[in-house]
From Swiss-Prot:
Lineage: Eukaryota, Metazoa, Chordata, Craniata, Vertebrata
Intracellular or extracellular location(s): Cytoplasm, Cytosol; Membrane
Top-level taxon of origin: Eukaryota
PTM annotation: Isgylation negatively regulates its activity. N-myristoylation is essential for the recognition of its substrates for dephosphorylation.
Manner of cofactor binding, per the entry note: Binds 2 magnesium or manganese ions per subunit.
Record-linked PROSITE patterns: PPM_1, PPM_2
Catalytically driven reaction(s): O-phospho-L-seryl-[protein] + H2O = L-seryl-[protein] + phosphate; O-phospho-L-threonyl-[protein] + H2O = L-threonyl-[protein] + phosphate
Regions of compositional bias (Basic and acidic residues) in chain numbering: 1-14
The protein's name in its UniProt record: Protein phosphatase 1B
């Protein structure tokens, strides 16, 4: 669960789509981890009468990808088909769910899928001990329902600022710790029984076998927290991401970075790729996944912002050339040396929230062109200290 590769796998999975007045893009990268355990869901138009609703989610698997992958395909179905989610009239016709129907139905869907997966032979006999966080949004014409189970996170940006974010479920949180202790467990080194770093998750059945306790009273609970927010014209975008992103970017930093990138590109896959690359260069050692959902009021491409960004790229290209020419007299410098020099300079118009790491790819491209035989180290590595102030 904590094994790393010698070099990160930087190939990305991308997708995008649009509908119901929304646009979305997503990106995922294995990074330094030995396995890719993340998964995602993106559904614009929920079947069976909720075509003007949409659902997006990110799942951060651990100890394997089995639970994350199954939930990415089947969680929405477990939510929308249970009796708590949708009431019916006397003729049996499904009615538009109320706010309370939706919130109760989401909770029921999580408990049902968790109980259903428990019967899978590999999960039941302990051959597979995987679990997964889940963070998502269900978007109706009037509301945004934020759903969280674990330490992945969702953030809403409105009027250029963080308007709302879900709260991580960590074992050291007082309410989580109380439940863990009441179930006979302990919190050591901020982990459940010194092992698991999240206090709520789907799967993880080794932590859900305390006799006399219900499913939401176990060491690890599958119960999500669900919040509803009325949609507003000022809504700009929602970000869903696993902790591989949040480990190196705060809510505010990520929203600032996304906002600035939307002003230079309307390609949401590109924006998501920039986030993932920037987090890799900031030192993230985990799998990384992000789903970006944009509303009609999301930032638009600005000619001024595009010009400013191009000027920044040209400045960085020129500085890398100067550094390498100057250092070349004593031998070609490595990329870490170039980055350390740049990190000490006052460079204007770096991407807010991303800093120099947000332009690492530009710097790498120039470095590789001038020194094609040099390994550029592939990721963050020894650059974390250089970029810590950025």
């Amino acid at each position: 669960m904590g094994a790393f590769l010698d070099k990160p796998k930087t190939e990305k999975h991308n997708a995008h789509g649009a509908g119901n007045g929304l646009r979305y893009g997503l990106s995922s990268m294995q990074g330094w981890r030995v396995e890719m355990e993340d998964a995602h869901t993106a559904v614009v138009g929920i079947p069976h009468g909720l075509e003007d609703w949409s659902f997006f989610a990110v799942y951060d698997g651990h100890a394997g990808s089995r639970v994350a992958n199954y939930c990415s395909t089947h969680l929405l179905e477990h939510i929308t088909t249970n009796e708590d989610f949708r009431a019916a009239d006397k003729s049996g016709f499904a009615l538009e769910p109320s706010v309370e129907n939706v919130k109760t139905g989401i909770r029921t869907g999580f408990l049902k899928i968790d109980e259903y997966m428990r019967n899978f032979s590999d999960l039941r006999n302990g051959m597979d001990r995987s679990g997964s966080t889940a963070v998502g949004v269900m978007i109706s014409p009037t509301h945004i329902y934020f759903i969280n189970c674990g330490d992945s996170r969702a953030v809403l940006c409105r009027n250029g600022q963080v308007c709302f974010s879900t709260q991580d479920h960590k074992p050291c949180n007082p309410m989580e710790k109380e439940r863990i202790q009441n179930a006979g467990g302990s919190v050591m080194i901020q982990r459940v029984n010194g092992s698991l770093a999240v206090s709520r998750a789907l799967g993880d059945y080794d932590y859900k076998c305390v006799d006399g306790k219900g499913p939401t009273e176990q060491l690890v609970s599958p119960e999500p927290e669900v919040y509803e927010i009325l949609r507003a014209e000022e809504d700009e975008f929602v970000v869903l991401a696993c902790d591989g992103i949040w480990d190196v970017m705060s809510n505010e930093e990520l929203c600032e970075f996304v906002n600035s990138r939307l002003e230079v590109s309307d390609d949401l896959e590109n924006v998501c790729n920039w986030v993932v690359d920037t987090c890799l260069h900031k030192g993230s050692r985990d799998n990384m996944s992000i789903v970006l959902v944009c509303f009609a009021n999301a930032p638009k491409v600005s000619d001024e912002a595009v010009k400013r960004d191009l000027e920044l790229d040209k400045h960085l290209e020129s500085r890398v050339e100067e550094i390498m020419q100057k250092s070349g007299e004593e031998g070609m410098p490595d990329l870490a040396h170039v980055m350390r020099i740049l990190s000490a300079e006052n460079i204007p118009n770096l991407p807010p929230g991303g800093g120099l790491a947000g332009k690492r790819n530009v710097i790498e491209a120039v470095y590789s062109r001038l020194n094609p035989n040099k390994d550029n180290d592939g990721g963050a590595g020894d650059l974390e200290d250089s970029l810590v102030a950025l």
